Amino acid sequence: MQGNLSAWLVKHALIHRSLGFDYQGIETLQIKPGDWHSIAVILYVYGYNYLRSQCAYDVAPGGLLASVYHLTRIEYGVDQPEEVCIKVFAPRRDPRIPSVFWVWKSVDFQERESYDMLGISYDNHPRLKRILMPESWIGWPLRKDYIAPNFYEIQDAH
């Protein structure tokens, strides 16, 4: 079954893959990393003006990494705004996805957290650096193949 947004993207010859609907009836689409920035701009112009959240996860050990965006189309006088979930998958060896910071500024810290925890590099992000872990930290703690160190060096704040 195809949702409204998927039908609109097909009508305008924009490449994507429909992943169906989640348990709340929200349409989920897969977009290729190379197409993500241009489709993000189109979605913003189409009315998806609110980025509700962005997160990332490790699909499987040795597999792909995913960056997930939850977008909402907020309009005056509409009680049930349209929502869509976009998934962008990247290879583990060189996980690069275009940043959508210049489309939705609210993604700033969320993309930085995804970089810090999973190592996904968001191209053209203005401040892509670690946000939770120290800059000297080695590895990506939320990857399924991450091996936790046996010790942690605690630095004195004084």
From Swiss-Prot:
SUPFAM superfamilies: Nqo5-like (SSF143243). GO terms for cellular component: chloroplast thylakoid membrane. Pfam families: Complex1_30kDa (PF00329). GO terms for biological process: photosynthesis, light reaction. Keywords: Chloroplast, Membrane, NAD, NADP, Plastid, Plastoquinone, Quinone, Thylakoid, Translocase, Transport. It comes from the Eukaryota. GO terms for molecular function: NADH dehydrogenase (ubiquinone) activity; quinone binding. InterPro entries: NADH_DH_suC, NADH_quin_OxRdtase_su_C/D-like, NADH_UbQ_OxRdtase_30kDa_su, NADH_UbQ_OxRdtase_CS. It catalyses: a plastoquinone + NADH + (n+1) H(+)(in) = a plastoquinol + NAD(+) + n H(+)(out); a plastoquinone + NADPH + (n+1) H(+)(in) = a plastoquinol + NADP(+) + n H(+)(out). It is found in: Plastid, Chloroplast thylakoid membrane. It is a peripheral membrane protein. Gene3D superfamilies: NADH:ubiquinone oxidoreductase, 30kDa subunit (3.30.460.80). Disulfide bonds: none annotated. PROSITE patterns: COMPLEX1_30K. PANTHER family: NADH DEHYDROGENASE [UBIQUINONE] IRON-SULFUR PROTEIN 3, MITOCHONDRIAL, NADH DEHYDROGENASE UBIQUINONE IRON-SULFUR PROTEIN 3. HAMAP family: NDH1_NuoC. NDH is composed of at least 16 different subunits, 5 of which are encoded in the nucleus. NDH shuttles electrons from NAD(P)H:plastoquinone, via FMN and iron-sulfur (Fe-S) centers, to quinones in the photosynthetic chain and possibly in a chloroplast respiratory chain. The immediate electron acceptor for the enzyme in this species is believed to be plastoquinone. Couples the redox reaction to proton translocation, and thus conserves the redox energy in a proton gradient. Belongs to the complex I 30 kDa subunit family. This is NAD(P)H-quinone oxidoreductase subunit J, chloroplastic. It comes from Guizotia abyssinica (Niger). The gene is ndhJ.
